[in-house]
Amino acid sequence: GSVPRSAGAFMPMGKAEPADGGYLVDGRWSFASGIRHSHWLSAGSIVVKDGKTTDEYIRVVFPTSEAVIHDNWDVAGLKGTGSCDFSVSDLFVPQGFSYPRAAAEPKRGGPLYRLGWPGFVAYEHSAFALGVGRRALDTIVGEAGAKIRGTQPSRLASRPSFQKSVGECDLRLRAARALVIQLLKEAWEQANHGIIPGPQLQGEMRSSATFATSVALDVVLEAVFRTGIR
């Protein structure tokens, strides 16, 4: 059958109080991308005992239909992610639908679900960021042949400073993409052998995603600087 679609928030913004056979969960979480397309939600929660918070951090899983979805994703960009808040109040979650953050082991789903955290999402963020950067660069290159800026009669594409900028941006995007792919290949090979990538590779994947996002942002800002907002 099909893979159930899930969404959620890893941040421990909820409270889970032990109850007979499970937990009573309260909380409101943000940035639940894709929530309106999901069947299940996973929510980070702090365990509360005798009215006091503990240092125990778990994730609870429950049907999306059990949560209130708050229509508060009113943004200028990324509208398509639909990253609305969601909340629950005194929701009973069975013990079997909770798991500790640090010791979670994939039970099914193949190598994709053995990539681990944060590697599992790092490559998704990288792909989006690099795509935005590449689109910005391709757009200004496509317009440069006809664009004239300021009082100079020459086309933007013929100016050495513009050519240098485009070349540097292109190389930086390629380098960031190559690094992301290299690390993902290493992680994927381990996952295919039943191994969850360890802390070093997880850190490298996260760092590569941060680096790719930084490069993409630089490219977009350079595109605006070189061509203007129109």
Segments and roles (model prediction):
Residues 147-206:
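A beta-strand-loop signature enriched in Asp, Gly, Thr, and Trp
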